[in-house]
Amino acid sequence: MQEILIPLKEKSYKVFLGELPEIELKQKALIISDSIVAGLHLSYLLKRLKALEVRVCVIESGEKYKNLNSLECILNSAFEMQLNRHSLMIALGGGVISDMVGFASSIYFRGIDFINIPTTLLAQVDASVGGKTGINTPYGKNLIGSFYQPKAVYIDLAFLKTLEKREFQAGVAEIIKMAVCFDKNLVEILETRDLKDCLEEVVFQSVSIKAQVVTQDEKEQNIRAGLNYGHTFGHAIEKETDYERFLHGEAIAIGMHMANDLALSLGMLTLKEYERIEDLLKKFDLIFNYKITDIQKFYERLFLDKKSEDKTIKFILPKGVGAFEIASHIPKETIIKVLEKWH
């Protein structure tokens, strides 16, 4: 069992990487999962969990259910179980479950503990660590949420055996995101080695990057923004396609392609660097046939991104390989020219 400490001022915790251990709790625990994950992995967790009382809340699977209705379902289950401030919630699932359970925990009785047990690669390397929680609204993605850290995170790679290839690749997109912005060495590992042979090493390294970034910038005031590479465009893509056509990681991959195009046009990437990042995305089949239906509407959606300030869109763009820059005040014409490539 490998451990990664995330030392924060208000709430430090550990990420455990290895076979899920027996978890003994002296309080009530509400497990929240989705309809697919519960069928695959709930019994595995229940065999390893001992608590004063355990109940399960199952919600529908998918990004489109990351909404107020599902949040209300979680909170109602907590009230019906009579959870108190000493109780906790357990998130068993992917990024959608992790985000919603974290948010529910942050507002129930003004905050109770929760544990993340991520079952997708995307959630293991990204969503379950760092304390970003939230739900989507008709206006955009994650526009209601909070920064709220888990009590602990348990990453068991055995969960990934049931993942479809598409889900796995979506998680790889988030790994590439971190590598391109923060770690040249990880880029080289992804370029030169078979991921199946080094998956545990790559997951450990990805979580370590996330841990270092979150430790330095928990509330996303500066360096943590680098974790949003591809997200300004990606969130607009998800909204345009009603959260149904693409998985989150797939939309982020398309967003990274767009960000690369913008970085190249601004001279932040050389053609060689641009092609290197593009080739890495292609290696993992993160190439998609996507066309923007209405460029002006798409452009306007970019302003709903949480990073936007004073009617200015902020983009996280790669600056070479292993670094990034927060770019703002980019002329509309420059952005539109990039979008036209995808029209």
From Swiss-Prot:
InterPro entries cross-referenced by the UniProt entry: Dehydroquinate_synthase, DHQ_synth_AroB, DHQ_synth_fam, DHQS/DOIS_N, DHQS_C
Pathway: Metabolic intermediate biosynthesis; chorismate biosynthesis; chorismate from D-erythrose 4-phosphate and phosphoenolpyruvate: step 2/7
Catalysed conversion reaction: 7-phospho-2-dehydro-3-deoxy-D-arabino-heptonate = 3-dehydroquinate + phosphate
A GO cellular component annotation in the UniProt record: cytoplasm
Keyword ATP-binding: no
Entry binding sites for NAD(+): 61-66, 95-99, 119-120, 132, 141, 159-162
Pfam family membership, one: DHQ_synthase
Annotated disulfide bonds: none
Family: Belongs to the sugar phosphate cyclases superfamily. Dehydroquinate synthase family.
Record's protein name: 3-dehydroquinate synthase
Source lineage: Bacteria, Pseudomonadati, Campylobacterota, Epsilonproteobacteria, Campylobacterales
